[in-house]
A protein has these predicted regions:
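Short, Lys/Arg-enriched anionic-surface-contact patches
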Residues: 2-3, 8-34
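Residues within the DNA-recognition helix of helix-turn-helix
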Residues: 67-70
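Alpha-helical residues within the helix-turn-helix
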Residues: 55
């Protein structure tokens, strides 16, 4: 039996949760979880390393690497195959923006 998934910290919810190509079949959507979205945001948009991203999300570096690889595969599939991408769900908790919990990279 697998271990229960640990809650990952994210710095905010995405403003846009659906991306739909003009001729996409909406029944065949790809689901990108919030932690996958956050790994893409932190590493590709903010320029963090895997180690820095792991620290912000409060998970191990190997976990971040797995999350990031899965997210990149899903993004590639959505772009190449012209499929709808839906962002949401997953075991996450929002950064509280309190001094003891602040990550320094909050979106808002």
């Amino acid at each position: 039996m697998p271990r229960p998934q640990r809650c990952r910290r994210i710095c905010g919810l995405p403003e846009h949760t659906k991306f739909i190509p003009e001729e996409a079949d909406c029944r065949d959507a790809i689901a990108l979880s919030l932690d996958e979205y956050e790994s893409i945001r932190l590493m590709d948009r903010e320029g963090l390393t895997h180690e820095q991203c792991a620290e912000v999300m409060q998970v191990s570096r190997t976990t971040v690497t797995e999350i990031y690889a899965g997210a990149r595969r899903k993004l590639a599939e959505a772009i190449v195959d012209g499929r709808m991408l839906v962002i949401g769900g997953g075991q996450v908790r929002l950064c509280q923006r309190l001094p003891e919990d602040r990550c320094g990279l909050c979106k808002n």
